[in-house]
């Protein structure tokens, strides 16, 4: 068996190069075997692209990244056109290689020490009132990137004192307590960490992650910050059953998670995990009813829902589908 070539710093691996490095073999999808996308997943493009262009230019000018672009989110046009974006810090190269995700894998460069200030200024220039800050996984860093998150939050609030900040964090594998100690110095307004799928599907979908670790991260943050909402997101269409997803909802509530996002998995390329089913809007409605009945304060459930989709409205408890 040939060993994978040594990763070079700053080089992005995508598609076949990326998924070839995971323990589960992903067979490229053939066009004739791919499920036809249903009508309810058609995205209406905005009449004007000027706002989209402006946001992209602001990101490029300051060397910043948005997960909207890096992960090929289907809602990019809508969110950018409404003047919202989810900023991705710590670079655009992830140390993990999840085969559902379109973010590049590789050996990241050293974190940009000026990124917190550049991010804060960009947010001020964009006149945003609510921002989501996420990151790639940085298993190469001793604290998993926690201090960089705290630095970004501090700088953002210095220039934008009225802003609300949601963090969508990685799992801080093997360093949860140390990371939470650091984050406690600059806690967000909403703490989000995605479970992504049911535990039976972790080996194929989230190599390197652990279902219980992710639950523990959410619970431990809530124990330290009982007044800050905790949130998690899941995808459907990776081979799970509705019953498996229902059990995940019960597990989240048992770990004091209050907010939920539930959406349809969409295959970024033929080299990624195939979509095994398209979940109907009616099924999402049923799971939303279950979530609300077991105590979630807000559940955004629908085919195009993503963890940061209209996050400001989610935080206000408004309907998002």
From Swiss-Prot:
Return the Gene3D superfamilies for the record: Aldolase class I (3.20.20.70)
Question: Where along this sequence does the record place binding of [4Fe-4S] cluster 2?
Answer: 94, 98, 101
Asked if the record carries the keyword Metal-binding, the reply is: yes
InterPro entries from the xrefs?
Answer: Aldolase_TIM (IPR013785), Elp3/MiaA/NifB-like_rSAM (IPR006638), LIAS_N (IPR031691), Lipoyl_synth (IPR003698), rSAM (IPR007197)
Predominant location: cytoplasm
Cofactor descriptive note: Binds 2 [4Fe-4S] clusters per subunit. One cluster is coordinated with 3 cysteines and an exchangeable S-adenosyl-L-methionine.
Q: Where in the cell is it found?
A: Cytoplasm
Q: What is a single molecular function from GO for this protein?
A: metal ion binding
Task: Specify the superkingdom.
Answer: Bacteria
Provide the binding site for [4Fe-4S] cluster 1.
Answer: 68, 73, 79, 308
Instruction: Give me the reactions it catalyses.
Output: [[Fe-S] cluster scaffold protein carrying a second [4Fe-4S](2+) cluster] + N(6)-octanoyl-L-lysyl-[protein] + 2 oxidized [2Fe-2S]-[ferredoxin] + 2 S-adenosyl-L-methionine + 4 H(+) = [[Fe-S] cluster scaffold protein] + N(6)-[(R)-dihydrolipoyl]-L-lysyl-[protein] + 4 Fe(3+) + 2 hydrogen sulfide + 2 5'-deoxyadenosine + 2 L-methionine + 2 reduced [2Fe-2S]-[ferredoxin]
One Pfam family named in its UniProt record: LIAS_N
What PANTHER family does its record include?
Answer: LIPOYL SYNTHASE (PTHR10949), LIPOYL SYNTHASE, MITOCHONDRIAL (PTHR10949:SF0)
UniProt family annotation: Belongs to the radical SAM superfamily. Lipoyl synthase family.
Name this protein carries in UniProt:
Lipoyl synthase
Q: Which gene encodes it?
A: lipA
